[in-house]
């Protein structure tokens, strides 16, 4: 018997030891638009493709990079509606922590709480796993941090990572370009060059998004004008 007959059951392991619905969720991530993150010596940058379904869509209404707290931001590959649900849950968790302890939630703690939510959706009846992987960028007392969270609920800290349909090219490029002493501006240039690998069409401020956080511990999404400036620098 193969794994196929188990593919509709979330809570039953297949004979090969897989939860097939999680495999399908990872397929949804793998067919999503490319996103990446780079941890620099003095900050973190996350970036993503933003391909719109039609030229009639107002690009300003599509935001793939979101704040979770003033010093933590996130981006996804996979299903946008699932991302919205996780963003809402993560923000609520951060607000509860702030109310209870009167200090901002540490990056690791928020990542762990978000991963716990995702893991719970892999062992409950009547639900399905989230069809997204997240890259979470933050800066707290422990310095700059970058985490990736997958549909299974597993999470790891990364120096640089990528996900989505162009993941193999992007990771190969990052492995060649990444250095421990990379500054934030250099990381932004590297992020743009990584997105260019396998990018269909011409890259512009209308079809990519970039978020960054530095030593000021304020996460922000770059404006189209700022992205244009960085694009001009890497030409």
Swiss-Prot record:
Family: Belongs to the peptidase T1A family.
The keyword Signal belongs to this UniProt entry's keyword annotation: no
Chain's role: The proteasome is a multicatalytic proteinase complex which is characterized by its ability to cleave peptides with Arg, Phe, Tyr, Leu, and Glu adjacent to the leaving group at neutral or slightly basic pH. The proteasome has an ATP-dependent proteolytic activity.
Main location, first listed in the record: cytoplasm
Protein name as it appears in the record: Proteasome subunit alpha type-2-B
Listed transmembrane segments: none
Localization, UniProt: Cytoplasm; Nucleus
Description of how the protein assembles with itself and partners: Component of the 20S core complex of the 26S proteasome. The 26S proteasome is composed of a core protease (CP), known as the 20S proteasome, capped at one or both ends by the 19S regulatory particle (RP/PA700). The 20S proteasome core is composed of 28 subunits that are arranged in four stacked rings, resulting in a barrel-shaped structure. The two end rings are each formed by seven alpha subunits, and the two central rings are each formed by seven beta subunits. The catalytic chamber with the active sites is on the inside of the barrel.
Positions bearing the Glycyl lysine isopeptide (Lys-Gly) (interchain with G-Cter in ubiquitin) cross-link: 64
Gene: PAB2
